[in-house]
């Protein structure tokens, strides 16, 4: 039987005492703090401009690239940050929550493309698309 109730129904989901920080490494927490800072300092203003003018949020993605986030899930040996799916989920949530939902959506598509390349990397694909990420190139 469930220990908690949701109205008249048993509650089987996560309780209020669950803390998502439990699954983050110290490095991932540092990355989140950096992201929140970037969102507050620049991304949010860029989001307003992009939304008002119906523009692709290029500057926000460039900003993510300047700090290594475009290569978040790329192994360190190829110039990426070498993080896992938990860091990816945290990054998307943080960008959407504190900065720009459009940027978060574009970032998801970007990492999806990067992941597809990394699933079956060839020297040509690595040189053309993956290694430039370390310089922040989209």
Regions found by a protein language model. Name each.
Residues 2-7, 37-40, 68, 76:
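Alpha-helix capping/hinge segments and adjacent helical runs
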